[in-house]
Amino acid sequence: MTATSAMNPADVPHVYPKNKWLIAAAVTFGTLMGTIDTSIVNVALPHLRGTLSASVEEITWVSTAYVVASVIVMPLTAWLGMRFGRKRIYLAGLVLFLIGSFFCGTARSLPTLVVFRILQGIGAGSLQPTEQAILRETFPPKEQGMAMGLYGFAIMLGPAVGPTLGGYIVDNYSWPWIFYINLPVGLIGLVMVSRVVHDPPYLERVKGGVDWWGMTFLV
């Protein structure tokens, strides 16, 4: 009689990749863009207000919609990563962010811009938690502090650089370019992540449901 049994994920040896810093750089691209976009729009709001004929209260939704969408998505990211794979979720978030960036630049009405800022926020909200998970799986425990330091640097650098970068772009070009600038950087990150990031073999796919009541109260 032949006995077969499924291997316990805990029994699978964890082999850390040799190109760990390349992986760290790849996933930091998206996180840096996402954090920059929390503040890059702020300096362009007066220009957007005039172009879109919006009031002061209305134009603030361009910033608020992005932040709210990001915050709502973050709690779902861990469940989605376990169900579909962290690499897929990261790539999907980056693609959504880039699509949202492109259509934000083409928007010619406030409702349209807010809708695509929400799409941007959904994509960005999945990047930060997924990067943390990828870094923890990529680096051994003794090096995770340095990896998280890189992550923290991106989180701090984005909001600091955003207003300066946004002001320069608006003064020298036009407001759509604060969104279009994401495209070449994001495409580089997309190619890098697709080539160097791989889910570990022990990652379990969970089939549990979502706490929809919890998500409702969060919203």
Regions found by a protein language model. Give the residues of each.
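Conserved MFS/SLC helix-loop-helix module at the cytosolic interface between two early adjacent transmembrane helices
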Residues: 72-111
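Extracellular/periplasmic helix-loop-helix junction of adjacent transmembrane segments
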Residues: 44-73, 110-115
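Interfacial helix-cap and linker-helix signal at transmembrane-aqueous boundaries
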Residues: 48-49, 80-81, 165-173
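Cytoplasmic helix-loop-helix junction between adjacent transmembrane helices
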Residues: 118-153
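Cytosolic juxtamembrane N-terminal segment immediately preceding the first transmembrane helix
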Residues: 1-36, 50
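Residue-level signature of mid-helix packing/kink "hotspots" within the transmembrane helices
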Residues: 39, 67-75, 125, 159-160
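Helix-breaking motifs and short loop linkers at transmembrane-helix boundaries and internal kinks
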Residues: 51-53, 85, 106-112, 140, ...
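Hydrophobic transmembrane-helix bundles of small-molecule transporters
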Residues: 171-219
